[in-house]
């Protein structure tokens, strides 16, 4: 048999992989003995090789999901997967590392037929790309008698979870969901509207750009707020995914660059949902500079997270809804019902009079008056939040997760923040609706981590607004969730991730419309999983996505 060069379709069936998790780590490989003419041993060698490929392809995805569920995966700012450091196939805590980007998974493993008779052996070897920690090649070499066969598959394995993107968006609005002069450095994921798959969720006819890199030296005002290893990343493993909807690429739009392509563009039903053509780059690929392009590729995609749906995250999986999780996990929870403010939890907390007075109107405005909403917990640690006005660079300290219900929040001045939950330098500040009131956040000045307390992303404060978030401050360094619209004024930059139903650029801070021609930016700085604000949206084990890059057999 000589089938060199024939493509092997490497279909990565994630639903099958998840099912395999229920029945154990590995499964016994068996094949039905198939003979053709007099070339039995050649056929058996090929099927031995194919058995090794399929077994360890499934095992790799099982390993990935298990590692993501365990946490502590680490990783830096660029392309990363928890498999990059090696594998723990026995799940005993001992990782077998790659040696020169090579790891032998099985040596002369026996393959039997349905009757238990040995028909061949295979050796399976995994190769990691030297430049890209998400790209792997699995090679399986089979033997039977004197015959030999070899099959291989190259694939990318990554996580499509909420905070693995620069922007994760919901249904958006009809027409021009993301357009004009916005610059996105990192991946974009749009759920879209299943009832309107012909809607354009991205109609990019201006200077819209989606890049796979960033260099914070071009943002000199914030460079010293970020860990040195995160200040410049040349490969973010960025992809563009649209579950329902179309994109249009025109004008001087850039999606990827010829010398730094995005990893994939996966839109709706495929090529028919990618229309238009931009000027001068990647002309043979509809003006899209990408390593792979096709229809939406996830079999079990993550939904847009909402407060009254269950959130299957590590922190919230035991709660019926994300709202209930926020309420139950909060170190401090304050409610405003009508004109009455109360501390919903913890019971018997003693707060400064300035705390509830600051929210009496229904809006907590952090401006020229200090506000102290801290208290001493039973273990002696501090809980709640405190805003200190100094007349220069103000300070917001958050101790544990804070939930404000029926209240809007406004940060009116440039603010440094300090976030702490136990030993972690992270926390979540949430504003939720109650009785039709509250749930919105305005950020009117710079909002950055206090570098004397810790550098981003190992020091991060997350924000949740059930309604809208409006960024008028030039630089905001925090992951944010807006159940409604995230608005950002032209010339402003958010560093981290945006999860919002709609992303909107505006021409000025008093505008509610989404202006197509305004240049604003989102720069994706990846937060290590172990330091992500625990109550922000996430999914246990992430959402693994496997992109087949091709295969061969011989």
PLM regions and their residue ranges:
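Extracellular beta-sheet-rich ligand-binding/adhesion modules
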Residues: 170-179, 186, 192, 324-326, ...
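Short, ordered "entry" segments at domain starts
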Residues: 120-330, 434-440, 444-446, 456-457, ...
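Low-complexity, repetitive regions of proteins mediating host interaction that are extracellular
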Residues: 39, 98-112, 178-181, 200, ...
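Short boundary motifs at domain starts and secondary-structure transition points
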Residues: 156-160, 393, 415, 419-421
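A general structural motif
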Residues: 393, 399, 424-426, 458, ...
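Beta-strand/loop motifs with alternating small/hydrophobic and polar/acidic residues, enriched
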Residues: 2-171, 192, 524, 529-554
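Sequence/structural signature of small/polar-enriched beta-strand/turn repeats
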Residues: 414-424, 429-431, 435-457
């Amino acid at each position: 048999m000589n089938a060199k060069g024939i493509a092997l379709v490497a279909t990565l069936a994630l639903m099958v992989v998840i099912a395999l998790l229920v029945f154990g780590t590995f499964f016994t490989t068996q094949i039905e003995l198939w003979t053709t003419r007099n070339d039995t041993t050649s056929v058996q060698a090929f099927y031995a090789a194919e058995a090794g490929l399929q077994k360890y392809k499934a095992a790799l995805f099982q390993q990935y999901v298990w590692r993501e569920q365990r946490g502590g995966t680490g990783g830096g700012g660029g392309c990363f997967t928890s498999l990059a450091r090696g594998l723990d196939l026995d799940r005993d805590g001992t990782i077998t590392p790659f040696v020169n980007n090579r790891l032998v998974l099985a040596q002369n493993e026996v393959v039997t037929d349905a009757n238990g008779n040995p028909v061949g052996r295979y050796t399976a070897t995994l190769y990691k790309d030297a430049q890209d920690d998400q790209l792997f090649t699995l090679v399986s070499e089979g033997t039977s008698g004197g015959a030999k066969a070899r099959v291989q598959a190259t694939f990318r394995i990554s996580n499509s979870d909420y905070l693995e993107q620069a922007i994760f968006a919901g249904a958006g609005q009809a027409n021009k969901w993301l357009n004009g002069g916005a610059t996105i450095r990192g991946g974009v994921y749009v759920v879209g509207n299943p009832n309107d798959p012909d809607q354009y969720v991205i109609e990019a006819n201006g200077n819209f750009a989606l890049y796979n890199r960033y260099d914070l030296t071009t943002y000199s005002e914030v460079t010293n707020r970020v860990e040195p290893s995160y200040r410049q990343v040349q490969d973010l493993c960025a992809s563009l995914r649209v579950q329902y909807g179309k994109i249009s690429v025109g004008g001087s739009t850039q999606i990827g660059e010829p010398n730094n392509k995005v990893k994939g563009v996966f839109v709706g039903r495929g090529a028919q949902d990618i229309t238009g053509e931009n000027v001068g780059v990647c002309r043979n690929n509809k003006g899209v500079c990408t390593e792979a392009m096709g229809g939406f590729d996830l079999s079990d995609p993550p939904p847009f997270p909402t407060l009254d749906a269950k959130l299957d995250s590590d922190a919230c999986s035991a709660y019926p809804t994300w709202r209930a999780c926020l309420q139950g996990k909060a170190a401090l929870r304050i409610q405003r019902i009508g004109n009455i403010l109360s501390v919903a939890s913890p019971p018997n907390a003693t707060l400064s009079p300035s705390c509830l007075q600051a929210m009496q109107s229904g809006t907590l405005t952090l401006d020229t008056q200090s506000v102290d909403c801290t208290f001493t917990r039973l273990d002696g640690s501090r809980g709640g939040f405190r805003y200190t006005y100094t007349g220069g660079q103000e300070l917001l300290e958050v101790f544990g997760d804070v939930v404000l219900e029926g209240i809007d929040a406004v940060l009116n001045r440039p603010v440094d923040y300090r976030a702490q939950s136990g030993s972690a330098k992270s926390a979540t500040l949430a504003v939720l609706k109650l009785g039709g009131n509250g749930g919105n956040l305005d950020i009117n000045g710079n909002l950055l981590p206090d570098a004397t307390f810790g550098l981003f992303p190992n020091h991060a404060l997350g924000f949740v607004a059930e309604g809208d978030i409006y960024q008028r401050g030039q630089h905001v360094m925090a992951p944010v969730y807006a159940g409604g619209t995230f608005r950002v004024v032209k010339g402003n930059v958010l560093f981290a991730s945006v999860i919002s139903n709609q992303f909107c650029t505006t021409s000025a801070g008093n505008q509610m419309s989404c202006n197509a021609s305004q240049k604003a930016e989102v720069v994706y700085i990846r937060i290590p999983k172990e330091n992500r604000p625990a109550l922000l949206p996430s999914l246990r084990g992430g959402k693994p996505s496997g992109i087949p890059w091709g295969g061969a057999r011989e």
